[in-house]
Amino acid sequence: MTPMYPELLTDLVTDLPHAVRLQRLVSGLRTHFRCGAVALLRLEEEHLRPVAVDGLVRDTLGRRFAVSLHPRLAAILARRDVTCFHHDSMLPDPYDGLIDEHVGEPLPVHDCMGTSLHLDGRPWGVLTLDALTVGTFDAAAQAELQRLTVIVEAAIRTTRLEAEIRALQLARGKQPDGEGPADDGEIIGQSQAIAGLLHELEVVADTDLPVLLLGETGVGKELFAHRLHRHSRRRGHPLVHVNCAALPESLAESELFGHARGAFSGATGERPGRFEAAAGGTLFLDEVGELPLSIQAKLLRTLQNGEIQRLGSDRPRRVNVRVIAATNRNLREHVRDGSFRADLFHRLSVYPIPIPPLRERGNDVLLLAGRFLELNRARLGMRSLRLSAAAQDALRRYRWPGNVRELEHVISRAALRCVSRGADRNDIVTLEAELLDLDGLELPAGSAHHAAEAAIAHPALPTGATLREAVEQTQRACIEQALRAHDGSWAKAARQLGMDASNLHKLAKRLGSK
């Protein structure tokens, strides 16, 4: 081993993007120790999240390793010293099937070592190294890793401090003592599209401007609303989520603004609404385009005056609430056809933020797939679950009309199919492209309407489908056709199907269509 201290120390005093610094760190360690793979994982509650890897497949960055399910990681995390697992260790390796040189195969006899990392006396995460040559991690290598641990922790501390300084500069104010910017964890992606979006969210988060999140169904608008709130000065106050499409028109006013005693039959007492519940914090109006015109007028007055009036009361009440709204509809078109108020649209869209669809996020689809693979692996009790190269290519090529939500369903369905076909849960299970069944989901341009009608008239059912499965597939097709016919409007789709909008939402969630 040649000393790598000069390179590490140079990176500590060089202004580098945090992802670049940590990637250079693990790549340098892999070269230094001449090993097969190195991973840096951050502890987040009961899971370890990879933040930089070298020698592991790309989707590893999207996975979350539950400490309780991975005894090697648990053992490393429990000690302050270096922990070594020799070639005869019986503990399962968390990276089985994920090493670049042996993708999809059980790892050959090999050595592993790792160390826990601490910042300010608290566990931060772990550093792991895997070598495919027995005897690589001898006593000298373990002692070297122990010495390097201090520099690794210093690199992480530098990265954290730089992130805090950037957040302070953007916020133009002081963070509470001992509290850095939240690391949300849920938003997975490294594409330029997602990096630009996160930067834009960071800029607007600490203002009180209304924000309108625009994006297709399934892009994760709620996650981005949560991120906005957590990075705002209101983060210590409630974030209240309102699904506007699920509000029955007769109850919408009471739900949003509250009601006085005797306002209607059954109103036996005072009841605050969602605006008052969000006092000092943020109100997230999801699917805001579904609000009826009568409620739009009252919402506009609240945004203009900062006051609400409970149903049945003539006393105005001041509210201090930031509003974030989201929609998958083209509100400008609805303004033109008179179904959405122009003045409310301009109030809500002070700062519109488009969220990119999954098809525009490049290799992010593989990181997200890694996340869902790990969730299904743990849920199904499997040793290892991964994608073949052909399956990865299929994920990249597919257009993803349902975005991240559809990807989650595709991975879950493929994992279940694999198990139902007799896959041994103790083996490394590889999902092939045909299991994803993306060819059956892809529709030629312009054929969506006819395909939906055909799906209802002649549903394509899996061989041996039960009556319940046939009914559920037909229900899905009916819902999808109604939504397409009404430009994604859940309220109008519910009316076409003869259902209450809230019941349609519940059914769609149960069927996995939402």
From Swiss-Prot:
- Which residues carry the post-translational modification 4-aspartylphosphate, per the record? D54
Biological process annotations from GO: denitrification pathway; phosphorelay signal transduction system; regulation of DNA-templated transcription
Q: What PROSITE patterns does the database record attribute to this sequence?
A: SIGMA54_INTERACT_1 (PS00675), SIGMA54_INTERACT_2 (PS00676), SIGMA54_INTERACT_3 (PS00688), SIGMA54_INTERACT_4 (PS50045)
Tell what triggers its expression: Negatively autoregulated; induced by anaerobic growth in the presence of NO.
Swiss-Prot/TrEMBL keywords: ATP-binding, DNA-binding, Nucleotide-binding, Phosphoprotein, Plasmid, Transcription, Transcription regulation, Two-component regulatory system
Q: Which domain of life is it from?
A: Bacteria
Tell me the GO molecular function terms: ATP binding; ATP hydrolysis activity; sequence-specific DNA binding
Pathway(s): Nitrogen metabolism; nitrate reduction (denitrification) [regulation]
Where on this chain does ATP bind? 215-222, 287-296
Keyword DNA-binding belongs to the record: yes
Residue ranges the UniProt entry marks as DNA-binding: 490-509
What region holds the Sigma-54 factor interaction domain? 187-416
Q: Domain comment? A: Deletion of amino acids 23-168 led to effector-independent expression of NorB1, a downstream gene, i.e. the need for an NO-induced signal has been bypassed.
Q: What is the purpose of this protein?
A: Required for the nitric oxide (NO) induced expression of NO reductase. Not required for expression of 2 other pathway members, nitrate reductase (nirS) and nitrous oxide reductase (nosZ).
UniProt miscellaneous comment? There are two very similar, functionally redundant regulators in this bacterium, NorR1 and NorR2.
Report the protein name in the record. Answer: Nitric oxide reductase transcription regulator NorR1
Q: What is the lineage of its organism?
A: Bacteria, Pseudomonadati, Pseudomonadota, Betaproteobacteria, Burkholderiales
Q: Which gene encodes it?
A: norR1
